[in-house]
């Protein structure tokens, strides 16, 4: 398996527990989006429904906590939440402050 989120952290780790991590997205992806973070599930799974109900709740709790922290820190006009997985088919969420 050649999954970038399984073989590397995916960015600077801001926080992690035994199930997921929050990373700060850097480089070209983040130039126009200060505060751009990803919440990445540690175990390789392609779809949210591959997680147990308890794991889905845990992951979404971390996503919402990340959103709340970014709102407090940056006071953006809007926060975008997205989970697509087309380029990297590994469960992860984008949490993007918009200004």
Regions found by a protein language model. Give the residues of each.
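HIT superfamily nucleotide-processing domains
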Residues: 1-99
């Amino acid at each position: 398996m050649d999954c970038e989120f399984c073989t590397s952290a995916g960015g600077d780790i801001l926080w992690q527990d035994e199930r997921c991590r929050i990373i700060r997205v850097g480089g070209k992806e983040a130039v126009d989006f200060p505060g751009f973070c990803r919440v990445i599930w540690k175990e390789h799974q392609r779809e949210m429904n591959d997680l147990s109900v308890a794991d889905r709740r845990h992951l979404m709790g971390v996503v919402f906590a990340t959103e709340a922290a970014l709102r407090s820190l940056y006071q953006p006009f809007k926060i975008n939440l997205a989970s697509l997985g087309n380029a990297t088919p590994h469960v992860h969420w984008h949490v993007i402050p918009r200004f």
